[in-house]
């Protein structure tokens, strides 16, 4: 699905996404450093020195001791966190700018695609569904791209932090990551089918809701004449209730991982403390290791929750993305290659003498029988004519053929 969604993006948009992922990689390095600096900082505060470890190669302060070592350690920590925050702010700005431009360009392209389609396209498609595609589907596609970026970005950061924690304590990190993996897998298995089903239902209910809302606004005169207000209000209420109910359920499901991971972290920390005490480790060492794991958990818990939430959102949004891809007709891909439909370069026709209809026939694509069959007639300039017939006999179709909105299936119109 992501490969097909990728095809909807133009070259510039793809370059922007690659640039954003490069920023995410930089963020991963800075996140890892911000976690890694905690261990030597705790060591300085508790012991007045940096333990001989991997981190000591990066933080060599010579013979500094006491307050000077504390000041230097705090300063380095502050600088790393400041650089990390500025980097994340810049990354956030780039992401929001890209998503805004994507929303604008995609909606504009789809609207132009619709507007430059043949008139018969509008006869074959419900205007409420087209309106839904222009407003709802384009915004959900942007949400799909955003969720994909969050999913991959958080995984990159998660891997970076995991490497740091593995160096600090391989066993403790393994226990934590294994526990997070098990809980994530269980939540995924229990919710994935439900989320996909909710996404499909959302498209159906959203289309019906838009249809009835547009009917009420665009056909208010007919609704009042036919005394259909109560029926239309009932239909809107029914679909609106279903729509808001679907939103409530998906928000509830996507909110569950955060609480699950919080409980998991408390249980895991308690288990680690018992293991360390049982191993007769010094209390200072226990505090030191728990300190870095505690700081890391402030990033791991929301990160794991965002990874799972973004994946759930991706599955929820996928049915809408499939509809949008169908709208752009990626099978033939002619529009996507050109980005814009060619302008009509035909020479304007001047009506000077008469219009001749020769064996004119027309059938709609969804029907086998002809709406008009073998029509031949001549209309001279200046003549006033009237076209009469029963409902459905083809009067409007003939007018649409005369003014060029429809193209004949057989025969021709000569001017």
Residues covered by each model-derived region:
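Transmembrane helix-loop-helix hairpins at lipid-water interfaces of multipass membrane proteins
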Residues: 21-83, 166-178, 277-287
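Short intracellular "coupling" helices and adjacent cytoplasmic loop segments at the cytosolic face
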Residues: 49, 100, 108-138, 212-235, ...
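Juxtamembrane loop-to-helix connectors within ABC transporter transmembrane domains
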Residues: 95, 115-160, 218, 242-244, ...
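Primarily ABC-family ATPase nucleotide-binding module
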Residues: 328-386, 414
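Helix-to-loop junction immediately C-terminal to a conserved catalytic motif
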Residues: 403
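Cytosolic ends of transmembrane helices, especially the final helix of ABC transmembrane type-1 domains
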Residues: 205, 221-228, 252-255, 259, ...
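Transmembrane helices of ABC transporter permease
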Residues: 23-26, 150-201, 271-286
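Hydrophobic alpha-helical segments in the permease module
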Residues: 77-84, 181-182, 258-261, 265, ...
């Amino acid at each position: 699905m992501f490969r097909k969604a990728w095809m909807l993006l133009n070259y510039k948009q793809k370059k922007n996404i690659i640039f954003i992922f490069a920023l995410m990689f930089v963020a991963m390095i800075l996140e890892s450093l911000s976690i890694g600096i905690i261990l030597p900082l705790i060591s300085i505060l508790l012991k007045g020195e940096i333990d001989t470890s991997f981190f000591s190669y990066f933080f060599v302060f010579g013979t500094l001791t006491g307050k000077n070592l504390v000041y230097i350690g705090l300063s380095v920590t502050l600088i790393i966190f400041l650089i990390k925050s500025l980097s994340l702010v810049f990354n956030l700005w780039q992401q929001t700018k890209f998503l805004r431009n994507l929303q604008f360009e995609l909606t504009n392209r789809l609207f132009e695609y619709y507007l430059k389609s043949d008139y018969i396209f509008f006869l074959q498609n419900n205007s409420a569904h087209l309106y839904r595609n222009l407003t709802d589907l384009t915004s959900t596609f942007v949400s799909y791209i955003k969720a994909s970026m969050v999913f991959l970005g958080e995984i990159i950061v998660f891997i970076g932090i995991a490497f740091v924690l593995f160096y600090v304590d391989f066993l403790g990190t393994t226990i934590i990551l294994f526990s997070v993996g098990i809980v994530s897998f269980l939540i995924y298995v229990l919710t994935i089918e439900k989320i996909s089903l909710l996404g499909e239902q959302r498209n159906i209910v959203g289309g019906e809701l838009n249809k009835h809302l547009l009917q009420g606004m665009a056909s208010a005169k007919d609704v009042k004449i036919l005394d259909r207000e109560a029926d239309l209000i009932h239909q809107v209420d029914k679909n609106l209730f279903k729509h808001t109910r679907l939103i409530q359920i998906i928000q509830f499901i996507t909110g569950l991982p955060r609480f699950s991971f919080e409980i998991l972290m408390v249980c895991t920390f308690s288990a680690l403390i018992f293991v360390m005490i049982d191993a007769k480790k010094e209390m200072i060492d226990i505090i030191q290791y728990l300190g870095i794991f505690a700081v890391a958990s402030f990033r791991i818990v929301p990160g794991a929750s965002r990874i799972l939430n973004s994946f759930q959102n991706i599955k929820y949004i996928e049915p809408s993305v499939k509809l949008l891809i169908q709208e752009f007709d990626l099978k033939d891909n002619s529009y996507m290659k050109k980005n814009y439909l060619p302008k009509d370069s035909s020479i304007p026709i001047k009506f000077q003498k008469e219009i001749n209809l020769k064996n004119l026939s027309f059938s709609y694509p969804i029907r086998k029988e002809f709406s008009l069959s073998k029509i031949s007639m001549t209309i001279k300039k200046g003549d006033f004519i009237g076209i009469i017939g029963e409902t459905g006999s083809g009067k409007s179709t003939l007018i649409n053929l005369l003014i060029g909105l429809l193209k004949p299936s057989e025969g021709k119109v000569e001017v």
